[in-house]
Swiss-Prot record:
Domain of life of the organism encoding this protein: Eukaryota
Higher taxonomy: Eukaryota, Metazoa, Chordata, Craniata, Vertebrata
Span list, region Coil 1A: 92-127
Name of this chain's protein: Vimentin
Region annotated Coil 2, chain positions: 265-403
PROSITE patterns, per database record: IF_ROD_1 (PS00226), IF_ROD_2 (PS51842)
Length: 461
């Protein structure tokens, strides 16, 4: 009796776990009300065989089959075999015990399935709420943020493109200026080479003029020495002639008596004086002409040298100015090229940063789409599991209803041993167990549902 009460309590608690309250009478209660009949029934009980196959896939169905074991034996009203009745009662008792244990096991499994279904329903609700939140707010907000970010990036790219175009125009203008300055530099270098060539030729002319001046100075010195020598010689000759004339005058004075000799000497003296004065005049004229020529040549060479020196100084100043200008232009060119390289590097770095930002945003969008698709797949899997569990719950509910209907069926009383001659044949408690399979197909693409279909199949066993 205690064992029967504990079984009733276990059955009642499992039923409460399954259905959450007091509804229909439990299986254990039905069994306890009919426990007094199981020893007086001569009818062979049909053995229930439950076959529950787990779903191999998402859309697999649960099959629960009820089979009767063997046809009921025919009983004759003429003979009563008490041994057969005891055997039938023992077998019925064993079958009922096995059925109770099996039903208790099934009730426990059903309770665990109910808990699992409730947990999965809670998870399903949470995932549905997250999915609705992602669909309603997250997607639009992310889309708006993505569009805003893309607009900003496009605007920055356009701005950078315009700045790059301006920089390229400035670079082209600078390139043209550099080419023009390079051409000017080439012209100045050519002029510098020509000036250096002219300076070299002028230096040669100056050297030649210096050599000519030195030659002329040496010639002037030699001529001056010659003039001095000639003057000295002339003075000596004049002195000699004067001495001779003085002697002749003395002799003439002394020799007054010789008139012809005096006249001859006077004629000779006149001739010599005339010749000496003419020679002196010629020498002075030649000296003056030579000195004038040399002075003129020296002055001319001095002017040429001074002009050459002035031109050389002018060319030297021009070369220095052009060298300074070339150095300044080279510095300007190097600074412009350095600025252009820095601008290109900065623009390249900014373009790479923007490209990395765009790639990162695209990766984030792709990851969010993948996550949404994964949530949709998980949601679909949970829906499939829920449908499978609903099918299994419905099957177990029908099984329990059939078991309750079988248990609550009134059993015949064999206490009076009034047996009819008609043959009793046990029929299965549940002739046909209908099985309803619902197949729901959802097609998604890029995280969006594009097609959804539901198929209902009724199958009878």
């Amino acid at each position: 009796m205690n064992r029967t009460t504990s079984r009733q309590t276990t059955s009642s608690s499992s039923y409460k776990r399954m259905f959450g309250g007091e509804g229909r009478p439990s299986v254990g209660m039905a069994r306890s009300t009919l426990s007094s009949r199981q020893y007086s029934s001569p009818v062979r009980s049909s053995r229930m065989s439950y076959s529950v196959s787990a779903p191999p896939s998402i859309y697999a169905s649960k099959n629960v089959r009820l089979r009767s074991s063997a046809p009921m034996p025919r009983l004759s009203s003429d003979t009563v075999d008490f041994a057969l009745s005891d055997a039938i009662n023992s077998e019925f008792k064993a079958n009922r015990t096995n059925e109770k244990a099996e039903m208790q096991h099934l009730n426990d499994r059903f309770a665990s399935y109910i808990d699992k279904v409730r947990f999965l329903e809670q998870q399903n609700k949470i995932l549905l709420a997250e999915l609705e939140q992602l669909k309603g707010k997250g997607a639009s907000r992310i889309g708006d943020l993505y569009e805003d970010e893309m607009r900003d990036l496009r605007r920055q790219v356009d701005q950078l493109t315009n700045e790059k175009a301006h920089v390229e125009v400035d670079r082209d203008n600078m390139g043209e200026d550099i080419e023009r300055l390079r051409e000017k530099l080439q012209d100045e270098m050519i002029q510098k080479e020509e000036a250096e060539h002219n300076l070299q030729s002028f230096r040669q002319d100056v050297d030649n003029a210096s050599l000519a001046r030195l030659d002329l100075e040496r010639k002037v010195e030699s001529l001056q020495e010659e003039i001095i020598f000639l003057r000295k010689l002339h003075d000596e000759e004049v002195a000699e002639l004067q001495a001779q004339i003085q002697d002749q005058h003395v002799q003439i004075d002394m020799d007054v008596a010789k008139p012809d000799l005096t006249a001859a000497l006077r004629d000779v003296r006149v001739q010599y004086e005339t010749l000496a004065s003419r020679n002196l005049q010629d020498s002075e004229d030649w000296y003056k002409s030579k000195f004038a020529d040399l002075s003129e040549a020296a002055n001319r060479n001095t002017d040429a040298i001074r002009q050459a020196k002035q031109e050389a100084n002018e060319y030297r100043r021009q070369v220095q100015a052009l060298t300074c200008e070339v150095d300044s232009l080279k510095g300007t060119n190097e600074s412009m090229e350095r600025q252009m390289r820095e601008l290109e590097e900065s623009f390249g770095c900014e373009a790479n940063n923007f490209q990395d930002t765009i790639s990162r945003l695209e990766d984030d969008i792709r990851n969010m789409k993948d996550e949404m698709a994964r949530h949709l797949r998980e949601y679909q899997d949970l829906l499939n599991v829920k449908m499978a569990l609903d099918i299994e719950i419905a099957t177990y509910r029908k099984l329990l209803e059939g078991e309750e209907s079988r248990i609550t069926t009134p059993m015949p009383n064999f206490s009076s041993f009034n047996l009819r001659e008609s043959m009793l044949e046990a029929r299965p408690m549940i002739d046909n167990l209908s099985k309803k399979v619902v197949i729901k197909t959802i097609e998604t693409r890029d995280g969006h549902v594009i097609n959804e279909s539901t198929q209902n199949h009724d199958d009878l066993e």
